[in-house]
């Protein structure tokens, strides 16, 4: 399967660089998996697609202000993007500077703070801070907006690049499907008899890394930490018993649930995952999906194609572009029910050259 099969042309004007005034005011493109039918709605119309007894699974990770600016002892400027918090004082981070810092060297953080470069682990640097990491980041860190937003972070991003139910600090990118939900909408969902459960997957910066191989099967996913508790396992079992559907809010919730069910049975799990879901891979847990519009040739677009079917997904994206939907993290959303017989690119009907 070729990565190039997942490309599409997106007008720059459709990249959402700022959030809308209200979370719930996004548009919603629905895709019916069994038929491929599309419908253009508003995000609050999601309520019409939910049934009493359904279970919605959210990712409650909290985005940390993971971008720091500073300088080396030599005076050279650098930029730090925390990838993973290791403990109260240590992190793994990407460091951008003219010359990489050496082990044992000091880094002075703009706004106050100091770190030592401990060791290099491939592309990541292990840094030890003189004070506790999370309070330091809250004090002087910047929200790690995706590269395609292409603007400095603003004060409003601290609130809007964060779900209203975020609890567990550790992500360096938001689980963006959740950005559309406000408290009144969550209350309306509960009032309809829809249950909720929460997993945690700390989204890493690798989510924005391009796929650098030609064949999908040659791609190696970055690792991210996740936790699926026994309460989630029990909630899914209860949902199945009452005939409800498991609806994942975001691709990170999908990856969490399917990672915890790799052998076909959902079990509690805590640890790293590098699961790569692309067309041809079965789904063991998820019946429906709320998700944003993803980058061309991205692993997230491949996941959606695995869930909805490749031709159906690409047709939906073409329709979204035609109708002016806003793309990526601050953009609009889709609601997709699983295609029971999804096809992959190489399974599509061949062109007639007669």
Swiss-Prot record:
InterPro entries listed in its UniProt record: QueA, QueA_dom1, QueA_dom2, QueA_sf
GO biological process: queuosine biosynthetic process; tRNA wobble guanine modification
Any GO molecular function: S-adenosylmethionine:tRNA ribosyltransferase-isomerase activity
Stretches that traverse the bilayer: none
Functional pathway: tRNA modification; tRNA-queuosine biosynthesis
Keyword Nucleotide-binding: no
Catalytic activity: 7-aminomethyl-7-carbaguanosine(34) in tRNA + S-adenosyl-L-methionine = epoxyqueuosine(34) in tRNA + adenine + L-methionine + 2 H(+)
Subcellular location, principal: cytoplasm
Domain of life: Bacteria
EC primary class: transferase
EC number: 2.4.99.17
Location in the cell: Cytoplasm
Residues in the signal sequence: none
GO cellular component terms attached to this protein's record: cytoplasm
Keywords annotated in UniProt: Cytoplasm, Queuosine biosynthesis, S-adenosyl-L-methionine, Transferase
UniProt subunit comment: Monomer.
Family membership: Belongs to the QueA family.
Function: Transfers and isomerizes the ribose moiety from AdoMet to the 7-aminomethyl group of 7-deazaguanine (preQ1-tRNA) to give epoxyqueuosine (oQ-tRNA).
HAMAP family hit by this protein: QueA (MF_00113)
The protein, known as: S-adenosylmethionine:tRNA ribosyltransferase-isomerase
Taxonomic placement: Bacteria, Pseudomonadati, Pseudomonadota, Gammaproteobacteria, Pseudomonadales
